[in-house]
From Swiss-Prot:
GO molecular-function terms, A-Z: small GTPase binding; ubiquitin-protein transferase activity
Positions of the catalytic residues: C879
Compartment(s): Golgi apparatus, Golgi stack membrane; Cytoplasm; Endoplasmic reticulum
Any Pfam family the entry gives: HECT
Pathway: Protein modification; protein ubiquitination
Designated name of the protein: E3 ubiquitin-protein ligase HACE1
Species this protein is from: Xenopus tropicalis
Domain HECT: 577-912
Enzyme Commission code(s) on record: 2.3.2.26
SUPFAM superfamilies in alphabetical order: Ankyrin repeat, Hect, E3 ligase catalytic domain
Gene3D superfamilies on file: Ankyrin repeat-containing domain (1.25.40.20), Hect, E3 ligase catalytic domain (3.30.2410.10), Hect, E3 ligase catalytic domains (3.90.1750.10)
ANK repeats: 23-55, 64-93, 97-126, 130-159, 163-192, 196-226, 228-253
Length: 912
C-alpha cells in the first residue's frame, strides 16, 4: 500500500512539473535528461533529480567528452554550476580538447561562473591541447574586467600556447587596448617572441591594430623582425595599414626611407603601397612633399639603372614604372589637384608642390641625351658604324655618374642639374674611340636593339610624370615637344620592334596629335595584337570578373519583351547607368526564367537584326544586298535620332563585351565610325553606276567635253527638285579639269555624309559612351567589321568552283595552282582579309560564292594575270571583284607578296 502511494505521488509530481521526477539509473540516459535543465539553469529541478540518484556528476558524455559542469560554465548557468560543484564536480576536468570549465567560462565571458570555479580551486594555469589557458581566452575576446580578477591567480602571465604565443600576443593582434594595458601592468613581457620570432608589436602590425601598436611603442617595445626577416613595417605595407605605418614612423623616423625603398619590391602589392602612402601624404603638407621627393629620387636611381645595359631590363623596367605610377597617384591626391585648375604642372615647376619633380630632371636629361646621341651617330655613321659602339660605352659611364649624383641628391645635397650640358658630353665623346676599340664593335642597329626597350620604358615614365601635372584630357606641351624633337629616333625604335608601341607608347592613345605620327606603323601591326591593346586599354580600371554576369542587384537586370524587343530594350538601356553596363550585362526576357551569357548573346543577335528592320526606317539596304547604310529619310520616324543613338549604344556595348552582332554596314558607314573621310569609291555601295561615272570623270580629260557641270547638284527633297550647292556659290563655279577632283570629293561627301550627318551624329553619341574614338581608330573599316560581326567561315572549294580567270590565266596554270595551295594554307583570318581585299566585303552571300555581287550585279571572283616584276604586290579592283595577280616565279614568292598585301594594305578601285 505504501509503495503504491509513493508511485502515485511520483506520478502526480511528474504530471504537475511536466517532466520526470526520477533519473534513470543509466548515466548516459540520465545525463541527457539533466543537460537541458542545466542549460536553462533549472537548479531546483536538477537538485530534486540528483537528490535521490546515484548519478556521477563527473560523467563525461558526447563527442567531446564534457561533463555537466562544462555545460553550466559554457552557458553561464551559475546556480547549476554551484550545485554541481557542491556535489563533487571536478572544476579541473578536461574535455577531449583539453578545455576545463574555467576555459569555457573565460571564452564566453561568464564572470560569475569564473568566480565560483576559482572558489572551488579551479587551476588557472591548465593549458588545453593547443596550449591555451584561461587568460588566453580572455585576451582573445578582450574581457579586461575578468582578466583583472584572474591575473592575481596566475603564476605566469606569459604562459605560451603551442605556437609560443602569450595572452599579450593575441590581445595585441585583436586590438584590445585595455586588455593589453592590463597584461603589461601585470608584468607581461612586451618583447617576448613566439616560436617564429614574432613579438606582440609584430602581431599588432599584422592586423593593422594602430592603438595597440601605439601602446606597445609608448611602453618601449622594440622594433624586431621575425626569424624570416619580416618586419612590422613589412606587415603594415602588405596589409595596406596606413595608420599603423604612421605610428611606426613617428616612433622610428628611419623607417620612412625604408618605406620609400619598398616601392621597388615587386613582391609587395602596388595597391596596398598606394593605400599606405596615400594615408601618410594626407597627414601634412610637409610629409606629402617629403614622400613625393623620396619617390622621385628612387625613380631617378632606378631609371638610370634601367639605362645601363648591364642591368636586368625586365626587372628594372617594372620597378621604374611601378614607382612612377605610385608617384603620380600620390601627386594627384595632393592638396591642389591639377584637375581643379590650381597649381598646374606646366607653369614651370615654380610651386613647392611641383618642386618634387626636380630630382627626375636628371633622368629626363639622360633620356634626352641618349636620343640625341643615337640620332646624331646613326646619321653620321651610316657607313662606318665603329664609332656607334662608343655611344654605348660612354653613355653607360655617364649614366653611372648620374646615379651617383642622384644618390647625393637623395641624402640632401642641393644644386642644379644644368651643368650636365649636351656640349660637355659631346666633348667626352671625342675621346672615346680608344675605349670603343676595347669593346666588341656594334653597329647602329645593334645599339638600337640593346637600348630601344630601355629608353622607351623611360619615355613612358616621362609621359606619366608629365600627364599627372595636367588637367584631365590635356596632353603636356612639354611631352608633345619632346616627341616632335625625337620623332625620327622613336619611329626607328618602333619600326625595329613594333611591340614597343603596345608595351610603352600608351601616350599615343591619349594624344591624337601624337597618334597621327605613328598611325601608319600601328596599322601595320598584326590585327590580333592591336585587338589585345584595344581591350587592354578599354577595360583598364574595370574589376577583373566575368564580363557578362548576373548582377547582385535585381534592378540592374535588363528586363525586355520578346514581342517588342527593340522598343523595350531601348527603354531599359536608356534608363541604365553606363558604368554599370560596362561592368556587366544581365538580360531576362519577360515571362522567362533563363539568364546568363546564352541569353545575352541571343539578345544581341535578335536586337541587331531589329535595328535594320525596315519598320523603323533607320537603315536601308545597299546595292550589294548584304550591307546597310543609314537612311537619309529616317526622319519619317519622329524618334529616329534617339533610335540611332540607341543603335550606337548597342553596337558599342557589344564591342565592349566582345559580343558579336548580326548586322553588316557599308564600308562608308564603318569609316564614319572610325572618323576616316569617305571617298568616291564608297559611293558604289549605294549607287554603283554613279560611282562608275565619278571614276570616269577622274580617269578622263573633261576639258573639251562640254559637260557644263557646276559645283551643285539637283536633289529630290520630299518630291520637289532642289539645287544644292556643294560649296558656297557652287552653282556659278564650273567643274574643270583642274578642280574635278575637288568636285568628286564634295559630291561624295554630300551623298555619303551630309545627307545623313544627323543620323551619324546620333549613332556616334551612343557608340562613344562605351568606345572612345582614340581607341577605335586603331583599326580600319575592314577590321572594324570583323570586330563587330566576327569572322565568317569560308568554303575554299566553293570559292575555287566559282572563280573566273582572265588576261592570260587559265584554271590549270602553275601560278593559279600555287595560289589555291596558298589559300588552303592561310588562316581563317587571312582568308577573310583576302576576300575583303578583292571584294571589299568579309562575307559570302547566302548561297555561296556564286552570288557575290559586283558593281553592276552578280560578278564572280576573278583572277587576272599581271606581268611580274620584282617585289610587285597583288592589287585588286573591288568594284568588279578582281584580283590582279602577278605571274610569280615560285609559290614562296607568291605567298610572301600576297601576305604583305593583305596585312599592309594594297587596296585599289579601278574600272574593268
Amino acid at each position: 500500500m505504501e509503495r503504491a502511494m509513493e508511485q502515485l505521488n511520483r506520478l502526480t509530481r511528474s504530471l504537475r512539473r511536466a517532466r520526470t521526477v526520477e533519473l534513470p539509473e543509466d548515466n548516459e540516459t540520465a545525463v541527457y535528461t539533466l543537460m537541458p535543465m542545466v542549460m536553462a539553469d533549472q537548479h531546483r529541478s536538477v537538485l530534486e533529480l540528483l537528490s535521490n540518484s546515484k548519478f556521477d556528476v563527473n560523467y563525461a558524455f558526447g563527442r567531446v567528452k564534457r561533463s555537466l559542469l562544462h555545460i553550466a560554465a559554457n552557458c553561464g548557468s551559475v546556480e547549476c554550476l554551484v550545485l554541481l560543484l557542491k556535489r563533487g564536480a571536478d572544476p579541473n576536468y578536461q574535455d577531449i580538447s583539453g578545455c576545463t570549465p574555467l576555459h569555457l567560462a573565460a571564452r564566453n565571458g561568464q564572470k560569475k561562473c569564473m568566480s565560483k570555479l576559482l572558489e572551488y580551486n579551479a587551476d588557472v594555469n591548465i593549458c588545453n591541447n593547443e596550449g591555451l589557458t584561461a587568460i588566453h581566452w580572455l585576451a582573445v575576446n578582450g574581457r579586461t574586467e575578468l582578466l583583472h580578477d584572474l591575473v592575481q591567480h596566475v603564476t605566469n602571465v606569459d604562459v605560451e600556447d603551442a605556437m609560443g604565443q602569450t595572452a599579450l600576443h593575441v590581445a595585441c593582434q585583436n586590438g584590445h587596448k585595455t586588455t593589453v594595458l592590463c597584461l603589461l601592468d601585470s608584468g607581461a613581457d612586451i618583447n617576448r617572441p613566439n616560436v617564429s620570432g614574432a613579438t606582440p608589436l609584430y602581431f599588432a602590425c599584422s592586423h593593422g591594430q594602430r592603438d595597440t601598436a601605439q601602446i606597445l611603442l609608448l611602453r618601449g617595445a622594440k622594433y624586431l623582425p621575425d626569424k624570416n626577416g619580416v618586419t612590422p613595417l613589412d606587415l603594415c605595407v602588405q596589409g595596406g595599414y596606413g595608420e599603423t605605418c604612421d605610428i611606426l614612423i613617428q616612433h622610428h623616423p628611419r623607417l620612412f626611407q625604408t618605406l620609400i625603398q619598398m616601392t621597388q619590391n615587386e613582391d609587395l602589392r602596388e595597391n596596398t603601397l598606394r593605400q599606405v602612402l596615400e594615408h601618410l601624404s594626407q597627414q601634412s603638407e610637409v610629409q606629402y612633399l617629403k614622400i613625393l621627393t623620396g619617390l622621385a629620387e628612387v625613380a631617378t636611381t632606378n631609371g638610370h639603372k634601367l639605362l645601363s645595359i648591364s642591368s636586368s631590363y625586365e626587372a628594372q623596367m617594372k620597378s621604374l614604372l611601378r614607382i612612377v605610377r605610385i608617384f603620380c597617384h600620390v601627386f594627384r591626391i595632393g592638396p591642389s589637384s591639377p584637375n581643379n585648375g590650381n597649381d598646374m604642372g606646366y607653369n614651370g615647376n615654380k610651386t613647392p608642390r611641383n618642386q618634387v619633380f626636380k630630382p627626375l630632371e636628371l633622368l629626363w636629361h639622360s633620356l634626352d641625351e641618349w636620343l640625341v646621341l643615337i640620332a646624331t651617330e646613326l646619321t653620321k655613321n651610316k657607313r662606318d658604324s665603329s664609332n656607334i659602339a662608343c655611344i654605348l660605352l660612354k653613355q653607360n659611364q655617364l649614366d653611372q655618374q648620374d646615379i651617383s649624383l642622384a644618390h647625393q641628391s637623395a641624402i640632401g645635397e642641393s644644386g642644379s642639374y644644368d651643368h650636365l650640358s649636351s656640349s660637355t658630353r659631346a666633348e667626352d665623346f671625342e675621346s672615346c674611340s680608344a675605349a670603343g676599340k676595347q669593346e666588341p664593335v656594334a653597329d647602329g642597329q645593334d645599339v638600337i636593339s640593346m637600348t630601344a626597350n630601355r629608353l622607351s620604358a623611360v619615355i613612358q615614365a616621362f609621359y606619366m610624370c608629365c600627364s599627372c601635372q595636367m588637367p584631365q584630357g590635356m596632353t603636356s606641351p612639354r611631352f608633345i615637344e619632346f616627341v616632335c624633337k625625337h620623332d625620327d629616333v622613336l619611329k626607328c625604335f618602333v619600326t625595329r620592334n613594333p611591340k614597343i608601341i603596345f608595351d610603352h607608347f600608351h601616350f599615343l592613345l591619349e594624344c591624337p596629335e601624337l597618334m597621327s605620327r605613328f598611325m601608319h606603323i600601328i596599322k601595320a601591326q598584326p590585327f590580333k595584337e592591336r585587338c589585345e591593346w584595344f581591350y587592354e586599354h578599354l577595360l583598364a580600371g574595370q574589376p577583373d570578373s566575368d564580363m557578362v554576369h548576373r548582377p547582385v542587384n535585381e534592378n540592374d537586370i535588363l528586363l525586355v519583351h520578346r514581342d517588342s524587343i527593340f522598343r523595350s530594350s531601348c527603354e531599359v538601356v536608356f534608363k541604365s547607368n553606363c558604368e554599370k553596363l560596362k561592368q556587366g550585362i544581365a538580360v531576362r526576357f519577360h515571362g522567362e526564367e533563363g539568364m546568363g551569357q546564352g541569353v545575352v548573346r541571343e539578345w544581341f543577335d535578335i536586337l541587331s537584326s531589329e535595328i535594320i528592320n525596315p519598320d523603323y526606317a533607320l537603315f536601308t539596304q545597299s546595292a550589294d544586298g548584304t550591307t546597310f547604310q543609314p537612311n537619309s529619310n529616317s526622319s519619317v520616324n519622329p524618334d529616329h535620332l534617339n533610335y540611332f543613338r540607341f543603335a550606337g549604344e548597342i553596337l558599342g556595348l557589344a564591342l565592349y563585351h566582345r559580343q558579336l552582332v548580326n548586322i553588316y554596314f557599308t564600308r562608308s558607314f564603318y569609316k564614319h565610325i572610325l572618323g576616316i573621310p569617305v571617298n568616291y569609291q564608297d559611293v558604289a555601295s549605294i549607287d554603283p553606276e554613279y560611282a562608275k561615272n565619278l571614276q570616269w570623270i577622274l580617269d578622263n580629260d573633261i576639258s573639251d567635253l562640254g559637260l557644263e557641270l557646276t559645283f551643285s547638284v539637283e536633289t529630290d527633297v520630299f518630291g520637289a527638285m532642289e539645287e544644292v550647292p556643294l560649296k558656297p556659290g557652287g552653282a556659278s563655279i564650273l567643274v574643270t579639269q583642274e578642280n574635278k577632283a575637288e568636285y568628286v570629293q564634295l559630291v561624295t561627301e554630300l551623298r555619303m555624309t551630309r545627307a545623313i550627318q544627323p543620323q551619324i551624329n546620333g549613332f556616334l553619341q551612343g557608340f562613344h559612351m562605351f568606345i572612345p574614338p582614340s581607341l577605335i581608330q586603331l583599326f580600319d573599316e575592314y577590321e572594324l567589321e570583323l570586330l563587330l560581326s566576327g569572322m565568317p567561315e569560308i568554303d575554299v572549294n566553293d570559292w575555287m568552283k566559282n572563280t573566273e580567270y582572265t588576261s592570260g590565266y587559265e584554271r590549270d596554270d602553275q601560278v593559279i595552282q600555287w595560289f589555291w595551295e596558298v589559300v588552303q594554307e592561310l588562316t581563317q583570318e587571312e582568308r577573310v582579309l583576302l576576300l575583303q581585299f578583292v571584294t571589299g566585303s568579309s562575307r559570302v552571300p547566302h548561297g555561296g560564292f556564286a552570288y557575290i555581287m559586283g558593281g553592276s550585279g552578280l560578278q564572280n571572283f576573278t583572277i587576272a594575270a599581271v606581268a611580274y616584276t620584282p617585289n610587285l604586290l597583288p592589287t585588286s579592283s573591288t568594284c568588279i571583284n578582281m584580283l590582279k595577280l602577278p605571274e610569280y616565279p615560285s609559290k614562296e614568292i607568291l605567298k610572301d607578296r600576297l601576305l604583305v598585301a593583305l596585312h599592309c594594305g594594297s587596296y585599289g578601285y579601278t574600272m574593268a
